[in-house]
Amino acid sequence: MNRNDLDRRLRELSIYSDFYYRKELKALVQLIGDGEQLNCVLTGVHEGNRKMLAVTDRRLIIIFAAALSAGDIKVIRREAVSEYRFERKLLFSKLSFSTSSGASFEFTNTQGSLKALFEWAMQQPLPEMD
């Protein structure tokens, strides 16, 4: 995927104006594989830092793009997510999910307006593997 393709997909999801300037997108362009479909992007505070969470048809990708130090990327296969919960509040919405291996993730101060998009992205069928 190149940046033009990413920008086009963000527009299709109606979230381009919320994220077009985020420095995490540079890493996301390199991480999304051929044929992989981006379905949701949101940001929130995870482990004390503001991070981006991208949901594709195959994976959840957590990106931390630090200004003065090395960033951090975590990739979770979508089929490994055993449960998720998105608590939408007027302010300070929270997303949490856990994996079948027992790992837990929590994003606070996230965009409550993206709850429906996140849930839609998580409900999309996993692609067939050859």
Where are these regions (language model features)?
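Acidic, Ser/Thr- and proline-rich intrinsically disordered linker/docking segments
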Residues: N2-G33, T43-G48, A66-D130
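Polybasic phosphoinositide-binding surfaces of eukaryotic membrane-targeting domains
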Residues: G48-I63
